[in-house]
């Protein structure tokens, strides 16, 4: 949603039509409810998680722009949290992202992300589009109770600008 709002490819109150499914090549993609919603705004499509609308919006963005935002939100790379064993997740290479892959990635399939990446990307929206490095440690104290180290917020990158982030918060 934020990528499409940032790129002016969709507006919150723009009306879409959902027939309950969309054909992409030889695949039929349905909504999770398997029912059509008819006419609905983008805002309502986000609220109801309407797969077919996300497919339409991803097609407006295109694979290259869609991938740019996936990476901007930290998917496909480690967050840098201070614990071992963190996974990067799995994202199709751009060269292998066809129409079907783009369509299914638009609503969260054909992509593998970690719970920490998901939380961090949602936090980026709440932080006015800034993707921050997550941490488990706020501060370190010595045995007398003195703070010897305080973790400062570290911005990894801007995922989207503040205006689209606030629009997503309003959805």
PLM regions and their residue ranges:
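Beta-lactam-recognizing serine transpeptidase/beta-lactamase-like catalytic domain environment
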Residues: 3-171
């Amino acid at each position: 949603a934020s990528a499409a709002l940032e790129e002016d490819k969709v507006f919150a109150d723009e009306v879409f039509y959902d027939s309950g499914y969309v054909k992409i090549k030889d695949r039929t993609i349905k909504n999770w409810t398997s029912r059509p919603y008819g006419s609905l705004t983008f805002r309502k499509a986000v609220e109801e998680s309407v797969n077919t609308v996300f497919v339409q919006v991803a097609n407006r963005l295109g694979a290259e722009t869609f991938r740019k935002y996936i990476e901007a939100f930290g998917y496909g790379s480690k967050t840098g949290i201070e614990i071992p064993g963190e996974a990067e997740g799995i994202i199709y290479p751009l060269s292998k992202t066809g129409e079907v892959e783009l369509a299914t990635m638009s609503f969260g399939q054909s992509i593998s992300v970690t719970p920490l990446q998901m939380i961090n990307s949602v936090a980026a929206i709440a932080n006015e589009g800034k993707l921050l490095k997550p941490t488990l440690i706020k501060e370190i104290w010595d045995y007398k109770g003195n703070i010897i180290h305080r973790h400062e917020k570290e911005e990894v990158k801007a995922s989207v600008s503040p205006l689209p982030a606030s629009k997503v918060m309003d959805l």
